[in-house]
Structure formats: C-alpha cells, structure tokens
Amino acid sequence: KKKAIWIHNDIQIKIKEEFKYRILHFFFKDKYDYFDTYCAVSQGALDSFKEINKNKNKDKCYLVIPNYIDTKEIADKLKEKSDIKVDKEKVNIVTVGRLCHQKGIDIMLDNIKQLSNVRKDFHLYIIGDGDEKEKLIEQMKRLDLEQYVTFLGNQKNPFKYLKEMDLFYLSSRYEGQGMVILEAKSVGLDVLIPKHLEKYCPPIKGVDDVLLYLKKYKKSNKTKKFDDLNDYNNNIRKELNNLFDASNDK
C-alpha cells in the first residue's frame, strides 16, 4: 500500500524562526523519503514543503487537501449564551488563537494603537492563551489600550463570543491553514487577513493595507447568516476518497 503524510504548517518559516523545530527537522527530514504522497492543508504550506525538498522526491505525488470543518459542532456551540456584554454601537473585532510569536498578536496591537488615534468606536477581543500572554498584556498597557482591548483567555466554546462580533481579524506571521478564518466566516462574520496570508486561507482574499481597512470598516446591520460550508467540505471528502482509493492500489 502507498503511504501519505500531512503537512500542517509552513515548514520553511518554522525552520527559520523556531530553534526546536529546526533541530527536529534536522533529525527527521529523511523520514519523508518513506512516503509516496505529500498532502498539505494549503497551497502555502505545500509550496514551502516543496521548496525545502526541491532537490529530491520529485517523482512523488503532491496534493493540497484542506482540513475538514465540523460546522454541525459549530452550530451546536452557537446555541450557548454569551456571558459577556458587548457594545453593539461599536465595531466589535475578535481574534482566536494561541498567544505566541507565530500568531502576530503583537502586530495586531500595534495596528490597534494606530487605529485608536483616528477612531474610538471599536473594541478588540482576544480569545486564547499561550507563552506570550503576559508580554502581550504588558504591550497593551504600554500602548494605553486597556479601554480598547479585552483578553478573554482560553475558551472551550469561542463561538458563543464570535456570534456577538462584527469582524474577525487574523494577523499571523504565517499559517498552515487559517481554519479559524473559515470558522468565523461560517458564523457570518466579516473577515480580515493581510495579503501574505492568502495562500494559507483560500478562498479568503487578503488586503494590502490592514490599517486602512480598519479605518474605513463599517459594521453591517444585516442579520448574520450561518454558512454550513457544504461545498467546501464536500470537496474535501472527494479529495480524501480519491487519495484513499489511490493509496490502496498496489
């Protein structure tokens, strides 16, 4: 039987930015030779992997198969009542993710500081925990953003908060696949990503100037419409079935 391996991140950037990952890759990189098919969760992750392995494994199969998103579970979690009160007169911005260097929350806070100089009708909610939490809270205080930013910590059900928001903002330095963007889209939120994240978050289009987008953004008065991502998930099922059928060929 043929063997497949999944690529879940931008390996090229992780090697560059994370010492521990650099060591792991050095010791385990030859293991890739034992696989017949390389599946990446986004084109960005695949391009990065192919660049790292450009001088070998040219006869192998390379595929992009994104992660499946369980929208039924999301729909169930949306039924839970939020335990925070947001100001509906303001633009409520949210982000969800680990508070680590990769996710670029420090970049987000710098942009929020600049935004606060030109408009006051917004609030940012940060959902997640991680090694950089205290550092980011200190940055928030140093930038005098306490009235504009709330850290909600790690939440088992972030969707009960997402349904109260207007705009989801992802500021990662790099991704594997920006699943959280599609999850936010399924809830009915507008989504914002910088241009360099497009290759990790199809079909979402990124913007060249994030700050300009935030300055001009106007919240919609339309009722949020839930998207079950049916076409997206069906395409993944087809790709997986094709992969499994091919893997069972002798």
Regions found by a protein language model. Give the residues of each.
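Membrane-proximal helix-turn-helix segments that form the acceptor-binding/catalytic region
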Residues: 20-39
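A conserved mid-protein helix/loop that constitutes part of the nucleotide-sugar donor-binding site
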Residues: 91-114, 131-137, 179
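Aromatic "clamp/platform" in nucleotide-sugar-dependent glycosyltransferases that forms part
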Residues: 154, 173
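Acidic anion/phosphate-binding donor-loop and adjacent secondary structure
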Residues: 15-16, 50, 63-89
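A short, active-site helix/loop in glycosyltransferases that binds the activated sugar's phosphate group
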Residues: 35-61
